[in-house]
Amino acid sequence: MALLLCFVLLCGVADFTSSLSITTPEQRIEKAKGETAYLPCKFTLEPEDQGPLDIEWLISPSDNQKVDQVIILYSGDKIYDNYYPDLKGRVHFTSNDVKSGDASINVTNLQLSDIGTYQCKVKKAPGVANRKFLLTVLVKPSGTRCFVDGSGEIGNDFKLKCEPKEGSLPLQYEWQKLSDSQKMPTPWLAEMTSPVISVKNASSEYSGTYSCTVQNRVGSDQCMLRLDVVPPSNRAGTIAGAVIGTLLALVLIGAILFCCHKKRREEKYEKEVHHDIREDVPPPKSRTSTARSYIGSNHSSLGSMSPSNMEGYSKTQYNQVPSEDFERAPQSPTLAPAKVAAPNLSRMGAVPVMIPAQSKDGSIV
């Protein structure tokens, strides 16, 4: 009887306290960067909930250094979504009529800064309810690169590497062979799920096309690799070629330097010759003195000739100088030189010259 009474009392309390409630359970949500996160929040009202309906979403950032901040609010039949600058324009109610019992929101174009705890709070007096959701934003693997680290020659040791440019941990790797038998070499089986495969004592059987797939909880990426295991190269020939090439380069450089040096020396010599001061050449003899010498020599010749020898000799104009010896430009008239007395001429070093006189008939006096 006592147990039955207690059950009736508990039922009465439950009925009395039943009011607004959120039916969506708390949960953890993981989404990739750039995607849209759906945060559900559905509620039910009771007849006794007669107050105005207020819906409020808050965020607690993951760094735990900031207090809870409102990101979107519904109150008085109006929506306010300009509270949180980091989510401005990226948070919206999913329902056009939140009074119908759906206060869910979408957060678009997710960023790493959106990671945190989101709380949905619904109030309609006297009912109050809230739910929390943990949002985690992950980065999909992308920009994955496959490559050979080392020399892919027979007998060598090298590594096959698979490296994504970005991607949230944890990451899972899977290697596959796409060509020939499509079977991974037996020594590699232990590392098929590793980002690095260590190849020991490589053989030509390892040649082929391989793929590496990287994935995490929000996405995956893949890269391809073509492996060609070739015979060892002729290293002696390579070294000899490198040495010969180096010597030829040195010879060429030496020839260029020699030519440049020679050209500079020639230019320097030309400059020195161009600026060298030379002794002036003595001026040509005076035409007047030449003419006088010519006249004097003629007179001397005439003086030594007898009258009989002069009969066939044409009369020479002594007062004229042959034009072929003296062709000069006309000069401005000059004053006649002043006469100098004979004693003064002797002091000046003049030598007297005897000029034979000539009569009217041409005979020498």
Curated annotation (Swiss-Prot):
A motif (PDZ-binding) lies at residues 360-365. Expressed in heart, brain, spleen, lung, liver, muscle, kidney, testis, spleen and skeletal muscle. Residues 1-19 form the signal peptide. N-glycosylated. Palmitoylated on Cys-259 and/or Cys-260; required for proper localization to the plasma membrane. Glycans are attached at N106. SMART domains: IG, IGc2, IGv. This is Coxsackievirus and adenovirus receptor homolog. The lineage of its organism: Eukaryota, Metazoa, Chordata, Craniata, Vertebrata. The gene is Cxadr.
